[in-house]
């Protein structure tokens, strides 16, 4: 009796193993072709030891279990998010040698080390997006002892001006300010030159009037206080994105509704920060596929996939990169690329942190180091307010 039970379990185990193999190969074939998979084609490519009838029976069971769905036009099967999850969990990252060499060559565009840390991370995201041909985002903490190095003023109309501050670490801060009155021609350029000389501790060129100088100081002090408020008090990591238009080359996102869902999810700062922080201490890539995204953020199924991986300075995670794409991503190649990418980035960031003695802080509702007094705010961020003056 015991022998019969053991033989029955063995036969069941072998059948389950074959069904699993059919699922993996059907998913693999779908990822390669982006076409529904039929039993005949699967037999010809990866399952020559199985009959077409047996494969169809396995397809039917996998469809019942929610791993495959039938394409009503061709009769072939299409993997669901459950199938892609199973595929990811049972395959290791893989890259061909020529792919590795091409990626390593592309990564030489990144600097060996740099103090311009935010700009370099943005450059890294552009490189990664170019390699994968997919949208990329990354989260970043705030880096300490930053300072403003450049100011630009851009007129929108007669009463509004865009104020652009750029910092030593590559941060860019913009805000819109209202002018008290319409300025004469070239007046804004003279004010901009005055403020740039101030930042560089150079004397004024004397070309602007006292009224223009007073207005420049008022505008500068206003925008610096706004900048310091954002810089010192933040509840989420800084989030940067690039390459969103690359979604358009995938058939899945040619449907306006699917594209809108994917973009809405990727551009939701709260959801993306939550997703990027989920496995911040896991050094390998993590895939969130289909309904898994909805489970995490409590949203409708976006019918896409996001793959995340943290990036490190030495043994400390600083943030994470995220890649957005359709559910039929080439997971093995994406995982392998992300691992190579973050290994290189870790070397760069570690060298930069030790060479320039950089430090950072994470978001919190209130930061005890930053008070409401402007003098203490400016000491914390290495930005000085101009002397207070009244407009004449």
From Swiss-Prot:
NCBIfam families xrefs: hrcA
Which Pfam family would be a valid example here?
HrcA
GO MF annotation, one: DNA binding
InterPro entries, alphabetically?
A: GAF-like_dom_sf, HrcA, HrcA_C, WH-like_DNA-bd_sf, WH_DNA-bd_sf
Q: Which cysteines are joined by disulfide bonds?
A: none
Superkingdom: Bacteria
Keyword vocabulary terms for this entry:
Repressor, Stress response, Transcription, Transcription regulation
- Taxonomic source organism: Chlamydia trachomatis serovar A (strain ATCC VR-571B / DSM 19440 / HAR-13)
* Similarity annotation: Belongs to the HrcA family.
Q: What the protein does?
A: Negative regulator of class I heat shock genes (grpE-dnaK-dnaJ and groELS operons). Prevents heat-shock induction of these operons.
Put simply, this protein is called: Heat-inducible transcription repressor HrcA
Q: Which GO terms describe its biological process?
A: negative regulation of DNA-templated transcription
């Amino acid at each position: 009796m015991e022998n019969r039970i053991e033989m029955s379990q063995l036969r069941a185990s072998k059948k389950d193993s074959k069904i699993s193999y059919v699922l993996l190969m059907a998913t693999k074939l779908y990822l390669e072709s982006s076409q529904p998979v039929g039993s005949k084609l699967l037999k010809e490519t990866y399952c020559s030891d199985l009959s077409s009838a047996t494969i169809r029976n396995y397809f039917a069971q996998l469809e019942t279990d929610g791993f495959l769905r039938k394409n009503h036009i061709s009769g072939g099967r299409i993997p669901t998010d459950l199938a892609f999850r199973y595929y990811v969990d049972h395959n290791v990252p893989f890259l061909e040698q020529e792919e590795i060499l091409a990626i390593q060559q592309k990564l030489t565009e990144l600097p060996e080390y740099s103090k311009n840390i935010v700009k370099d991370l943005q450059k890294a995201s552009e490189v990664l997006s170019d390699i994968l041909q997919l949208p990329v985002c990354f989260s970043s903490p705030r880096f300490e002892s930053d300072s403003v190095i450049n100011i630009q003023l851009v007129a929108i109309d007669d009463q509004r001006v865009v104020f652009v501050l750029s910092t030593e670490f590559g941060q860019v801060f913009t805000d819109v300010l209202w002018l008290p009155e319409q300025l004469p021609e070239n007046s804004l350029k003279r004010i901009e030159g005055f403020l740039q000389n101030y930042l560089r501790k150079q004397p004024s060129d004397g070309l602007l009037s006292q009224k223009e100088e007073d207005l420049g100081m008022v505008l500068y002090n206003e925008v610096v206080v706004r900048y310091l408020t954002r810089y010192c008090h933040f509840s989420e990591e800084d989030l940067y994105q690039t390459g969103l238009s690359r979604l358009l080359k995938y058939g899945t996102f040619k449907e306006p509704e699917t594209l809108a869902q994917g973009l809405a999810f990727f551009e939701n700062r709260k959801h993306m920060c939550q997703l990027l922080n989920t496995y911040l201490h896991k050094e390998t890539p993590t895939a969130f596929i289909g309904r898994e995204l909805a489970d995490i953020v409590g949203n409708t199924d976006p019918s896409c996939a996001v793959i995340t991986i943290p990036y490190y300075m030495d043994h400390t995670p600083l943030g994470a990169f995220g890649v957005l794409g359709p559910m039929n991503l080439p997971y093995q190649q994406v995982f392998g690329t992300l691992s190579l990418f973050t290994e290189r980035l870790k070397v760069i960031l570690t060298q930069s942190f030790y060479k320039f003695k950089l430090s950072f802080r994470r978001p919190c509702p209130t930061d005890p180091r930053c008070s409401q007094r402007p003098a203490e705010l400016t000491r914390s961020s290495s930005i000085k307010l101009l002397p207070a003056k009244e407009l004449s």
